[in-house]
Each structure stands twice: as C-alpha cells, then as structure tokens.
Amino acid sequence: MEDMKPSTASTKNLHHDGVGENDTIEVRFTDFCKIGLSVSEDAYEEAIKLFKGTKHLLLANISAIGNGMPEEAERFWFAFVSYSVKRLSEKIRDNMQQRPDDNGLTLCQILRRAKLNIVDFFKELPQYVVKAGPILSTMYGVDWENRLEAKELQANFVHLSILSRHYKRAYRELFLTSDANVDKQSATAYMSDYHRFGWLLFLALRVHAFSRFKDLVTCTNGLVSVLAILIIHVPVRFRNFNLNDSQRFVKKGDKGVDLLASLCNKYDTSEDELRKTMEKTNNLIADILKKKPHMASEYKNENLDNINTDGLIYYEDLMEESSLRSSLDILEKDYEDAIRCKGELDERVFINEEDSLLGSGSLSGGAISVTGTKRKFDQISSPTKTITSPLSPHRSPASHTNGILGSTNSRMAATPVSTAMTTAKWLRTVISPLPSKPSPQLERFLASCDRDVTNDVIRRAHIILEAIFPSNALGERCVTGSLQSTNLMDNIWAEQRRLEALKLYYRVLEAMCTAEAQILHATNLTSLLTNERFHRCMLACSAELVLATHKTVTMLFPAVLERTGITAFDLSKVIESFIRHEESLPRELRRHLNSLEERLLESMVWEKGSSMYNSLTVARPSLSAEINRLGLLAEPMPSLDAIAVHINFSSGGLPPLSSVSKHEISPGQNGDIRSPKRPCTDYRSVLVERNSFTSPVKDRLLAFTNLKSKLPPPPLQSAFASPTRPNPGGGGETCAETGINIFFSKINKLAAVRINGMVERLQQSQQHIRENVYRLFQQVLSQQTSLFFNRHIDQIILCCFYGVAKISKVNLTFREIIYNYRKQPQCKPQVFRSVFVDWSSARHNGRTGQDHVDIITFYNEIFIPAAKPLLVEVGSAGITVKGSQVPEVNNNKDGQCPASPKVSPFPSLPDMSPKKVSAAHNVYVSPLRTSKMDALISHSSKSYYACVGESTHAYQSPSKDLTAINNRLNGNRNIRGSLNFDDVDVGLVSDSMVAKSLYLQNGSCASTSGAPLKTEQPDP
C-alpha cells in the first residue's frame, strides 16, 4: 500500500544494539551466574550458550517484558535462561543417570538474585517460551517444553498458595498465638515453631508419599492429617478450642470425641482416605524423626483427655520444647536433600512469609487461580457468593439428595480448598458407588446395534483410561525416599481415578443413549455407538472432570486430548451434551467445562493440528491452499491398537476385540473427520445437532440470534458425521458446512460478550462503536477467516476496536485499548505481546518465515492489508466516503454496503444488575489524560494505522463520569430479559462472564448521542 505505516521503532529504541553494549550484557549475565548463583563451570558454559542464542530476542522485546524498562527486562531474561538451563540440563542428566554438577539451585534462589517475585516470573515466562522456543528446541530437543514443566510448576505454586492459606486459617482457629503463662517473645516463638513444624511435616508427606500425583484433594487430606497430629501433640495451653464444642467436634461417643471423623466432617474429607494418610504421616514421623510410636489408647496425657484414642498414635516429646527444635532441623535437612538439584520451587517460602518473593496479583494454575499473598480472605471468595448463592442455579433434585449440600459447611463462604473438597465429595458419594461396568439398560442399547458392541466399548474404555491414568512409573518425576512405596501409591491413585472416570462415562453414556432413543423413537444407535471419536471424546470429558475434581498438577488440560488422540474441536462437540445429561454435576465442574469450552473457542481450535481445519477445507474450499501451506491440518487419529501398544496395555481379563469391530473403528471410519469420503448410508447420522454446538452458559448469557435450523432437536450422533455428507436439513449444505457455520456462530457469540465488556470498560457510550466492532469482527471471520489461523480471537477483537475507532474518528489509542484489555478477566499478556505472523505469504520488506510480533505490528502489517476493504464497508454503513478522505461518520444514515453480506446486529445480551455482581469486581473510573497530535503519517491513511504514544480518549469530567455511574447503579430501567435461575439445564453463570456482562443494555442504546440501533437482520 502507498500509505505510510508508522512502526513500533520508538519502542525498539529502548535497547542498545551496539557491540559494546552486547558485551556488557554478557558480562552482567556472567556475574549473575558465577557470583550471584555460584554455578559450576559446566553449568555456566551451557547457560552462556543459551543466553547468546537468545540475546537478540531480549534486545528486540525489551519494551514488552515486565515494566518495559531495560534493567528489569534484563533481570527477567537472566532468570528465564538460568531456570531453563537448570531444568532442562537436569532432565538430560536424569535420563543419562549422571550426578548433577552444580549445587542445589532452586527457582527461589534464582529469583532472589534477580530481584523478582514468583508471580511476576510466571506472568512473563509464557512469552519467553514462545520467543525462545525454536532455540530451546535446537539445544534440548523437541520435547523441551514438556521437560521444562513450567505450567506444572505454576499450577503447583498456585495450589501451595491456596493450601498454605488454608493451613494458616485452620491453625489459627485451633491454636493460640500466645500463652499467658510465658512472655510474649517466647510465646511467639512457640507459635511459629509449631506452625512451621506442621508445614514441614506436610512437605515431607508431599515428597515421600504423594510423589507424582500432587493433587489438591490428596494434599488437603495430608494437611488435615497434620492438623490431627498437632491437636494431639501441641501443649494444651496453646489450644484455641474446647473438645466439648459440639459444632467443631460433631462426632462424639462414649469414649469421647472421634477426632478424625470430626475433622472429616469439617473439611469434607473422606474418613477412609484420611486414616490411610494418617498412617503415612505416622510412618514419616517414625522414620525421619526417629520417634517411637505409642498406641494412644495405652498412653495417658492431658492432650488426649476427652478424645477417643482408638486407632490413634502418640509420640512422646514430639512437641516438647526440648525436642521441637531438633525435629525442625531434621525436617529442614530432609526437605533440602529432597529438592537438591531439582530446580523446583522451595515450598518452605510459604511458611517464611516472604511476601517480596511470593509477589502479588492474580495467577492461574490448572482449574483454579490465586491472587498474591496480600489478598484477604474476603477477596478469595466474595462475601456475597457462597455455595448457596443466588448466582448459582438451583441444582437438580438428584444433587440435593446425594448429600453434597447437606454438610454443615454449606453456607460457609467458599474457598478453593473447600470447593475442591465439596466436589470430591460428589465424586465419592455419587459416582464411586456405581458399577464399573455398563448397566443393564446401557447393555441393552449396546446389544441393540447392528452387532453387539459391548465388548468394544468396554475394551476401548480401559485402554483410553489407562493411557490417561498410567499405572506404571513412566514419566516418573522427582521421587525421593522409598521409590517402591511412592510408585505403589501412584498406582493406587491412578486406579482409583480410572474407576471414577469409567463409572462417570458409563453413567452419562447411558443418559445420552436414552435421550437419543427418545428423539429417534428407536433403540438401534449403531451410528453413535460405533463412532470411535465420539467415545474418545466422552472418555476424555469424564477423565477431565475427575482430574479437575482432584486439581491434579501433573496432568493439566489439554493432557486428555494428547493421550486420547482427539483434538480441541472434537471435544467441543460433547461438552454441552455432557453437562445436560449429568444433572447432578456440581456447580464447579459445570464451571470448569464451560471455561474449557471458552478456551477451546478462543484459541485452541485455531491452533495447528486442529481437526477444525479438516472440516474447513470441505466447507470453505478457497481456504484449502492457505491451510495446507501453513500445515494446519490434523494428523489422523491414532488407532486404539497403537495407543494400547504405546502404553504397553495388558488386555488380561478384558473381552477380545473382534475382527469386524477392528475394521469398523479404525481411523477414517465412523465419523473420523480426517477421512471425509465415507458415503451417506444412514439418515439418522446426517443431521447436525444444534445442542452439541452450544453451551448452556452461553445460551443463557448470550440469549440472542437463534441458529437457523427449524428442525426439532436432532440426534447427537450426527455431530460426528463425516464432513462431506449432505445435510438434508441444511438447505443443500454438507455436514461440514453446517458444522462450521454453527461453530462460527459460537465464535461470534463469545466475541459479542468480550466486545461488550471492552466497550463498557472503555466507557465508550456510543452504540455505533459496539455495533461496528461486532460487525467488523463478523465480516473478518466470514471473509478473511485466515486472519484467525494460529491466533487468539482477542487479537482480532483488539484490532477491530482500533480500526473502528480510527475510521469513526474516536480518540482511542491502542495503548488505551490494551490498558483496559489487561483488566478483562480472560486477559493474558501474550495475547497482545506475541501474535503469530507468516511473512512468506506477502510483501514484508524482505522478511520471510514465521515469527511472533506485538499486536501493533500485526495490525499494521497483516490485519489492515487484509481487512481494510471490510473496514471501509463497515464505516460506509451510515457514512459517505469521498475520494481518499477519511470517511466521516453520519449517524443519520443506517444502510449497509450493498457489496457486503448481511451480518447480524449486535445481539441483545441479558441485563445484569450490579447488585448481583461479586463485591470483588470494581467499577473503574479512568483518570483524565492529555492528547497528542499524530503527525507521523499522511492524513489519508492515518485512519487505519496504529502508532505507539497516540492520544488517549478524552473523558468527561470526573463528576460527570461518576454521576453517570451512579445513574446506572440506581436508575430505573426497563428490563426486557432476565436470567432463569430455576432451569437446571442452563448451566452456570461464571464470575468471568458476570464481570464481562456488567451493565449490559439488552440491546437498548446507552448512548446520549441518539445514535439509532442498527436494524439489519440475518439471512432468513
């Protein structure tokens, strides 16, 4: 294009790229390694090699790291490189069974030297992983990211943050912080030592007993066992409880308080699991501290008064002043030996209260998130949102009768730990008692197919679940102490999780078959029950719910996709149906599935290797060349036999797989999306199910623009039909076309919510801004679909915002857009810092290959050349374009460019009262900012391009802004839509969706400018 394109060169001026400065940076890194970290010469040589290989990335991205200052960016990069070398070289040595050649360097030591905190480190690490990935792959192999285990370490940090707070609260409830009989200083020391002893004993459990599967539920059981040890052994004068307290110790008998049963009742733990954990804890005390165990029933001590001592162990002098300090020293040394040379997190940091090292701010890990150490309890869980909050839909009768809501804690404010334990109780009380084989009703469905598929279903389930929950020591992580005992516990844990997932799979499969039979008025469900991909999706969904319940650190999503051979696009087809057909599913698991669906839609289905691209080549043949050029197509789904061989599966005790069934479930058959040439022979498999492409949460929060289908609810099995099959209900469309259209409608719905949230946060009251951003997004998705390839939909939304702002002459800079986007619940910094580009397809100043750039570079170089015609069309809906002048906004016209396809108006989102929003969500009032005149580009083109440092939005006075906010909070509005909290099937209103839907307008214009609503309707 002839237009001048302002670049981000101003940001690059922050770094120095002279040879002398490069040498200086290397000198500083050398000092960091040799003086600061005292690494060995071999470790230094490896570190300096990686640093030299990635130094150019640091210099090119200084402004995008941390606060953008060179000094801080440098410290981050030093930490990234040091941590990478430590973890990856350690894994190589482990595989070669070599001894480590440096001291026991941990992540905490690296961060202390770099003057960084843990939260900030994990926030910035993803862009280093993206940028340095090719270099790390060259040095350490293609599996470097799995061996780095950065995501697992982050999830581990989040879990430990939550557990440490849980332990601290519980300890303060049970024990005094001072003793009236001793001086204050001594009492503080006692409290600190007892508190520290409990945490170190818990860490010993994690190291020696929990091993690979350090899930939140198991760890909570460990903490409760530690509390039991403390209650029995901490001197009575430090107690903050009375054993006669009927609310705290509810389990009593003739022999006194049943301590373990009472703790289980309070913390929703399994008594059987707690007793097993207590046994491990007692063994550790005997083995590590060399304390002699006594049967508590045979020992007299005031600590044991009024306690039923049957089955309890007592250790003499365990908590007495004479031995407490030596016990602490032994536990400290044991832990140091355990983590030596592993480069992992020093988990003692949570008891040391090193706030400067822990950091502050939000951080997510797995299915939960945490805010920094300064966060108060009422911020962990909003005081207005309890387990029985009106924000939660009423559960089905089944969930009320399973005992989940019947606990004494049902009205306590929910914490991450209590929520996890409540969910685990559902799994324990509702799912675990079920049979581990198909029920008679399910067997009838399986036997009613063209041939009996019962054996196939059973064998497949065992193979896939064995792949997800391996029982052998493959992939064993850091194991210290007794390897045999830890492997045994791993195997027991894996077997328990397999059984839970298996029982849940059979239960939901039966419910789905019953529903399908009612729709079809037949019991022959051959097309569905012989579909390999469908069953794998169901098994993956069941396993993911089990993993999410236990909050497992070492198998984070998308592990279930990788181990079952399916893709994100496949899984998205069953999520909604799974929720609808398991009425007792707890609130948190519904929330988890809905959040997964959002993750799938926003980025994962657009990643390389997604089966969505295989359908897209059928539905949009014009995109085939670009899809093939970028190598985006999914590989064939691995066969069941291949998975069985890979995991060394033993089929002993399982029914054999018939030769017929082997043929029928091989890749490419039964709806395999990668083999679309199968002829249509079964009408039941032709229709595409509407419900399999919509989420219950989004159905309620995004109640607008119903899908085009006028047919009654079609069968589930059709969602997995071969893409080239004709869809008789789709107006001549193939199943791929219908499926992609419905998939695109889901993307548009998600974008609508996020656009609306950004408009409200930006305080852009003009209705046409929201309408035009949404219109442009739809046009880009429909006509420039390749802009989404390998990208995040938020990247396109941000570009649409800026493009519409420029064409509409609204003073809104990219800097301000990103500043407000950072406050969105779904924001991740890498979204605007690292956007995928492929330079080989266009004229880009001689640049070739693939790269990741910042959002402004992507906007100028990629987005605008592709989307400028669409942007002009969107701007011309109500404006007049004259020559090369920037289009002027004319709100008196409400037309649509004849050349553009009709698009849906901005949907009518449900109105949400601010009073129903968590108190943790703030209403932001941005300060006044000054504006600048941009003279870097010509007048004719500056409507399209972005520059760093452009003027920000000119707000009204603070008094007017506050008045407007008060009017919204207190004003009377006509509400045309409402949330139905009585419909069990509609799912859950998650916090993030509530936050994003704050002050929604129900389609009414919030502008004071009088701009009319757009009235275009979708195609009939």
Swiss-Prot record:
Biased composition (Polar residues): 382-391, 398-409
Localization of this protein: Nucleus
An example molecular function term from Gene Ontology annotations: RNA polymerase II transcription regulatory region sequence-specific DNA binding
Region of interest: Domain A: 415-616
GO biological process entries: cell differentiation; negative regulation of G1/S transition of mitotic cell cycle; regulation of transcription by RNA polymerase II
Residues covered by region (Spacer): 617-737
Keyword entries, A-Z: Cell cycle, Nucleus, Repressor, Transcription, Transcription regulation
InterPro entries: Cyclin-like_sf (IPR036915), RB_A (IPR002720), RB_B (IPR002719), RB_fam (IPR028309), RB_N (IPR024599)
Region span, Domain B: 738-869
Region annotation (Disordered) ranges: 382-409
Function: Regulator of biological processes that recruits a histone deacetylase to control gene transcription. May play a role in the entry into mitosis, negatively regulating the cell proliferation. Formation of stable complexes with geminiviridae replication-associated proteins may create a cellular environment which favors viral DNA replication.
Family: Belongs to the retinoblastoma protein (RB) family.
Record's protein name: Retinoblastoma-related protein
Organism: Ricinus communis
Source lineage: Eukaryota, Viridiplantae, Streptophyta, Embryophyta, Tracheophyta
